[in-house]
Amino acid sequence: MSQTLLVEDLHKRFGSGRRLVWANDGITMSVNAGEVVGLLGHNGAGKTTLVNQIVGLYRPYSGRIAVDGVDVVADPAAARRLVSVQAQENVPITGISPRKAVELVGRIRGGRRSAMRQRAKGLIDALDMGEWADRPAEKVSGGVARLSAFAMAVARPGALVVLDEPTNDVDPVRRQLLWDEVRRVADDGAAVLLVTHNVREAERAVDSLVLLDHGKILTKGTTASVVSEFGGGFRLDVDVARGAVPAFPDGWGVHRHDAAHWSVSVPEGGGVEAAEWATHARAAGQIVRYELGPVSLEEVYVALTTEADGTRAA
């Protein structure tokens, strides 16, 4: 796969003196054609600042950004030709329908009228938004407006597609349809950068990810590699019987949410032992319910950001 986006040692700062803040601090990452990469981080992690530099709205303090081989720091206008963006906030559309808006954006980006008419129809059908496609855009719901913004971004995608929180306000059924369409866009050859703070959702949608915290990359790689490196093992959730105090094997980490609900971290390779322990504990009346599964990306992310915050505080 060819490398569509390359970010090298990127720094961006705001303010000065005691108010100096490094919004991006040494960011290096890439996105290949045909790949969906998740840029994950909480509010204030530096995601939007990074995106604004990629699309040419901000100039870095130092570092390099190339899109499809073009230095977009030296030529920010090229970024607007090469990158298709769904911004975090919907751009207000008035006077036309979602269908016409999608067709118009496709034509602005160089598509032929007939081809963009077919493309708009295909996207509207794929996202199941035909009921609202020909209504005035200013009168549709927030979820439909969000779907419309996504369809506009991918009507005639550039080499790089940046999607900033694309599923905000979208209902669960159409959210899955949107993710299916994201995959099709990548399969057709575009590089996709998905910006989100919803770790659980991103875990199902991306090929690889970059975890950002306070302007720095905590880790990057495939979901499986990140979980394996920093997590691994299993999580056992149990509902404890009234008055019971179950005894857990050595090496298991126990967190009591309250008297009845406990979470237990089980070391890697301990899945069978955990299942056997839970079965016996339930038969003995110590617990009334249990759920066992692998450690999730969300849990790894929370642990990494908590550890990083603790290190800074120290």
Model-identified regions with their sequence ranges:
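ABC ATPase C-loop
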Residues: 153-154
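Conserved ABC transporter NBD signature motif
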Residues: 63-74, 78-79
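Catalytic Walker B motif of ABC-type/P-loop ATPase nucleotide-binding domains
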Residues: 161-165
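ABC transporter nucleotide-binding domain
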Residues: 179-267
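Helix-to-loop junction immediately C-terminal to a conserved catalytic motif
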Residues: 55
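Conserved ABC ATPase "signature" region
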Residues: 103, 107, 115-132
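Walker A (P-loop) phosphate-binding loop of ABC-type ATPase nucleotide-binding domains
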Residues: 42-46
